[in-house]
Regions:
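N-terminal membrane-entry
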Residues: 165-167
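Basic-flanked hydrophobic alpha-helices used for secretion and membrane insertion
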Residues: 1-161
Length: 167
């Protein structure tokens, strides 16, 4: 996994590459069944965090009549790739991982003074200092422990569900 002290880095699942598309042809992997010619370990990967600004800049604005400037692109180094080909599925194949503290620091820097997309604001529209979550996933070491852990989470006042309920 990405090191905690190495700045923001991404670790890519082996099937993430299938979500890239060719901007010139507007085709994805699933359109052509050809893996994009991208080496995630060597090629620079540009990331746009301010997706609202991106879509506003590509669609002619936000409806106010003003042209929206394209948002800044960031090059995020790759710390590693999950083993496997695009045909090897696992529950983590389409995920991108990062050190959560490094990611939060980067988001706070990028959106300084503004709300990070998806985050709540106070009555004045100002962002809170903390990051809020509306969902977490808890992995349990053994099926025998799922109900106990689920009950502990529910006793803390949170909703909790598991696939074990369906078995």
């Amino acid at each position: 996994l990405p090191p905690a002290n190495g700045g923001l880095q991404f670790f890519y699942g082996n099937q993430v590459i299938t979500n890239f598309y060719n901007a010139k042809t507007n085709e994805y992997y699933w359109d052509t069944m050809t893996v994009p010619d991208i080496d995630l370990m060597k090629d620079p990967v540009f990331v746009i965090f301010d997706t609202d600004a991106y879509y506003n800049s590509t669609s002619g604005g936000d409806g106010s009549g003003q042209v929206t400037a394209p948002p800044k692109k960031y090059i995020i180094p790759t710390s590693g790739l999950m083993a496997g080909t695009v045909d090897d599925y696992s529950e983590n194949s389409y995920n991108v991982y990062a050190d959560i503290d490094q990611l939060k620091a980067m988001l706070k820097k990028i959106f300084k003074g503004k709300a990070i997309p998806g985050q709540p604001t106070n009555k004045a529209g100002k962002p809170y200092k903390e990051i809020y979550y509306d969902q977490v996933y808890v992995k349990v070491d053994s099926m025998e422990n799922v109900q106990e852990i689920q009950k502990v989470i529910q006793d803390m006042g949170y909703g909790a569900s598991s696939n074990a309920e369906w078995m």
